[in-house]
């Protein structure tokens, strides 16, 4: 009679296999090791294979995005060596990272080189060559970007559309664009975001150091801005989201720039700018305006005629000091009828320029003279 033992063993093994729990995604993910990628395609294809991604000396082909979208929760991305992008006219972005609880950082000598000079023609996004935006930090939630050194972006450097994102000690160096035709090289463009903290940033460029177009609970501290258009809110109005609320710029310097502090809203649009603080801002070498708040932007340019559809309320301007050029205006405020309310100004000491006689509808608590 055949032995039943093998049958028993098979049944036992089969039962054990059925009883064993399936490995969870979290367990599987935690077991994965560091992966080092040296080409963009493999990095994009295999980005969910590791908990720690190292990008080493990658050259991204022309017209392609280094795509790290939809990373696994908790992933760390580290740039090593030089990351470069080859030239092609297109909209970009050159780099995209998204996910939750993501850390983006680099080794001490790494450079993210956008090769912007190949696109620069003095036109920026207003014409000439089609230029790609550099880094989309969109849907990069509960995350941190730390210590990146970004050089020569074709146009705007970092576009932020995220919630609860910390950006610390990032350098954006587009200073070569001063002599080579850089234009619209914004440092940080923030839209439709909440709880964004930027500390210790250094921005050398030819447009806004920071531009907040919409969003709430945004904090910028310890920044060093030079060559551009200053610390800006707006233009607000005419977008899907037209609210900017609870924004603080503090303990920062703006030098060799067109403006120091700026808020601008769109003519005949609607929206809200509320609970805004500029505190301890040091200015030097400002060519146009030390402080400028105006409600007259149309098709990207000021018209001199304000409207009141966007309200600007609860604004604190304190301890803004320094110098502007002799033909610059120290303070310029152009509000619509009744749309600017509840402002306070204190500790304003801006010297070297002119006092504007063209201010309109200046709210109680503010002044165009010192």
Swiss-Prot record:
Alphabetized UniProt keyword annotations: Cell wall biogenesis/degradation, Disulfide bond, Glycoprotein, Glycosidase, Hydrolase, Repeat, Secreted, Signal, Zymogen
Any Pfam family matching the protein: Glyco_hydro_28
Active site: 207, 229
Catalytic reactions on record: (1,4-alpha-D-galacturonosyl)n+m + H2O = (1,4-alpha-D-galacturonosyl)n + (1,4-alpha-D-galacturonosyl)m
Disulfide bonds: 35-50, 209-225, 335-340, 359-368
Principal location listed in the UniProt entry: secreted
Signal peptide positions on this chain: 1-19
Example GO biological process: pectin catabolic process
Positions glycosylated per UniProt: 246
Listed Gene3D superfamilies: Single-stranded right-handed beta-helix, Pectin lyase-like
One GO cellular component term noted in the UniProt record for this chain: extracellular region
EC number(s) stated in the UniProt entry for this protein: 3.2.1.15
Domain of life the protein comes from: Eukaryota
SMART domains with a match to the protein in the record: PbH1
Keyword Cytoplasm belongs to the record: no
Enzyme class: hydrolase
Pro-piece positions: 20-32
Residue windows of the PbH1 repeats: 162-192, 193-214, 215-235, 244-265, 273-295, 307-352
Classification via PANTHER family: ENDOPOLYGALACTURONASE B, POLYGALACTURONASE
Function: Involved in maceration and soft-rotting of plant tissue. Hydrolyzes the 1,4-alpha glycosidic bonds of de-esterified pectate in the smooth region of the plant cell wall.
Family: Belongs to the glycosyl hydrolase 28 family.
Entry protein name: Probable endopolygalacturonase A
């Amino acid at each position: 009679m055949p032995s039943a033992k093998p049958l028993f063993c098979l049944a036992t093994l089969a039962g054990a296999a059925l009883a064993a729990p399936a490995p969870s995604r979290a367990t599987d993910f935690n077991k994965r090791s560091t992966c080092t990628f040296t080409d963009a395609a493999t990095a994009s294809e295999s980005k969910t294979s590791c908990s720690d991604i190292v990008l080493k000396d990658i050259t991204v082909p022309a017209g392609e995005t280094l795509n790290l979208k939809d990373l696994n929760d908790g992933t760390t991305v580290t740039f090593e060596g030089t990351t470069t992008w080859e030239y092609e006219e297109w909209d970009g972005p050159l780099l995209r990272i998204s996910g939750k609880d993501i850390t983006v950082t680099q080794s001490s000598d790494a450079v993210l080189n956008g090769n912007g000079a190949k696109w620069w023609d003095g036109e920026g996004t207003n014409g000439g060559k089609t230029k790609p935006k550099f880094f989309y930090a969109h849907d990069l939630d509960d995350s941190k970007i730390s210590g990146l050194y970004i050089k020569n972006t074709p146009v705007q450097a970092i576009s932020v559309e995220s919630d609860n994102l910390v950006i610390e000690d990032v350098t954006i160096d587009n200073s070569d664009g001063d002599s080579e035709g850089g234009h619209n090289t914004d440092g940080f463009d923030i839209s439709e975001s909440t709880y964004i903290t930027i500390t210790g940033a250094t921005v050398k460029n030819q447009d806004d150091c920071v531009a907040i177009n919409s969003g709430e609970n945004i904090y910028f501290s310890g920044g060093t801005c030079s060559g551009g258009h200053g610390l800006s809110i707006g233009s607000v109005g005419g977008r899907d989201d037209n609210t900017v609320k609870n924004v603080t710029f503090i303990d920062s310097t703006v030098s060799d720039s067109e403006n120091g502090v700026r808020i601008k809203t769109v003519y005949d649009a609607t929206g809200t700018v509320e609970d805004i603080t500029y505190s301890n801002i040091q200015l030097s070498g400002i060519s146009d305006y030390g402080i400028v708040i105006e409600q007259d932007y149309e098709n990207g340019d000021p018209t001199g005629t304000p409207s009141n559809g966007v309200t600007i309320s609860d604004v604190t301007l304190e301890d803004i000091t320094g110098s502007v050029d002799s033909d610059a205006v120290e303070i310029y405020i152009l509000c619509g009828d009744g749309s600017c309310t509840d402002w306070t100004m204190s500790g304003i000491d801006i010297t070297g320029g002119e006092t504007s006689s063209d201010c309109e509808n200046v709210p109680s608590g503010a002044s165009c003279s010192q």
